[in-house]
A protein has these predicted regions:
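An N-terminal hydrophobic leader/cap segment in hydrolases
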Residues: 45-117
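Short beta-strand element of the alpha/beta-hydrolase
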Residues: 139-149
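The serine-hydrolase catalytic nucleophile loop
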Residues: 150-164, 175
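Conserved alpha/beta-hydrolase
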Residues: 164-182
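Alpha/beta-hydrolase active-site loop
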Residues: 186-207
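Alpha/beta-hydrolase fold nucleophile elbow
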Residues: 207-218
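Hydrolase active-site cap/lid region
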Residues: 226-282, 291, 296
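Serine-hydrolase catalytic core
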Residues: 277-357
Length: 366
């Protein structure tokens, strides 16, 4: 030991003093090494966390704006025996497509690209089909536009025409990045709104329907709400399996499809989409635009087993927003239906709910 003067204490040998100093130095060195290790681990964790977040944001945003396209290319004639008019492409190409694809549910391509007759305000070419109603009401008869969901196309959404075809003209079209329409980033509504408006412009130029409604499935419903908020030509809306807020789509796909936590992945993906498109998708959530419908009626259909757009966070939220704003609204739930499968699980109910709603919305027809 040492005295307060720093000299060896009485009775302490020089070796004991040296050993004591060495022990103290060792303890201090050990503490420094411990702090360095903790700092290193924290730094590595930070780097790993930042790397993971950046990876999820980059990959997730790319997958969401560039979905794998639906390979179904069946036309109304092939699928249901219906006559139809092609929108913005030559009908002879359908024969070419059919001969090249014996299995039209799994086509190698969607055919020739759309022409120049229907172009959006940002230069995207849109293709579709016009299917006259079975009752022969003619082009001025009540018309329903079908807007498909994320990664789908006009062939996939055609099934919704089955209960409508008897009394309504029906239009099915490809959003950007799907079917015959131009390749462009998918944006879950804000730019798809322009695609829908281009189709309505075509209808107005060529058919002059007396009444017009839009049925949107999932993402298509979001685009329909955004369009209807500013386009009074849309007299009524049907939302099938449609989200309330865009961030919920991202978080649920992360959790359900990819097995990743919603945090920090959701904000990272939304940030990645902003970097790629310049759009803050949280500014385009349908629930925020539903009040703009005013007195135009809204029908909400949803499945109780939808794990992608949970009813409590989508259908219920949209319904309450409509009620609060005084929008005439109906809500029907299909027991056991998953996302986008209300019409598959409850086909009779879907038809009854939709046709009755449209009859009330359009009123008596001559």
């Amino acid at each position: 030991m040492t005295s307060s003067t720093g000299l060896p204490a009485a009775g302490a040998t020089e070796s004991e003093s040296t050993e004591g100093r060495g022990t103290a130095v060792g303890r201090r060195r050990g503490r420094r090494i411990g702090r360095l290790m903790i700092g290193l681990v924290a730094a590595l964790a930070l780097v790993a966390g930042v790397g993971y977040t950046a990876y999820v944001g980059a990959v997730g945003s790319d997958q969401l704006i560039h979905p794998t396209g639906n390979s179904d290319c069946r036309t109304p004639l092939v699928r249901y025996g219906w006559t139809y008019e092609p929108i913005n492409y030559d009908i002879t190409d359908d024969a070419v497509l059919r001969s090249a694809n014996p299995d039209m549910e799994n086509c190698s391509s969607q055919g020739a690209a759309a022409g120049t007759e229907v172009i959006t305000s940002d230069g995207v070419r849109i293709a579709g089909w016009y299917v006259p109603s079975a009752d022969g009401s003619g082009p001025t008869g009540p018309t329903v536009v079908l807007a498909h969901g994320w990664g789908a196309n006009k062939s996939e959404v055609l099934k919704y025409a089955v209960p409508l075809h008897a009394a309504f003209n029906v239009v099915a079209f490809d959003f950007r990045n799907g079917g015959r329409s131009s390749a462009a980033a998918t944006t879950f509504g804000p730019r798809e709104k322009q695609d829908l408006e281009a189709i309505i412009d075509w209808l107005e130029r060529t058919k002059h329907p007396a009444h017009l409604a839009v049925m949107g499935n999932s993402m298509g419903g979001g685009a329909a709400v955004l369009a209807a908020a500013t386009d009074q030509r849309i007299e009524a809306l049907i939302l099938d399996s449609t989200h309330a807020r865009v961030e919920d789509i991202v978080s649920r796909r992360l959790e359900v499809d990819a097995g990743h936590p919603s945090l920090p992945g959701t904000p990272a993906i939304l940030f990645g989409i902003w970097l790629r498109t310049g759009l803050n998708l949280m500014d385009s959530s349908p629930v925020d635009f539903i009040p703009a419908l005013g007195h135009r009626p809204l029908l909400i259909l949803h499945g109780t087993a939808d794990v992608h757009d949970l009813p409590a966070r989508s259908a219920d939220v949209n319904y309450q927003a409509a009620l609060a704003a005084g929008v005439p609204v109906e809500l029907h739930m299909c027991e056991g239906a998953g996302h986008g499968h209300v019409i598959d699980t409850c086909p009779v109910d879907w038809g009854r709910w939709s046709v009755d709603f449209l009859d009330r919305a359009f009123g008596p027809t001559d």
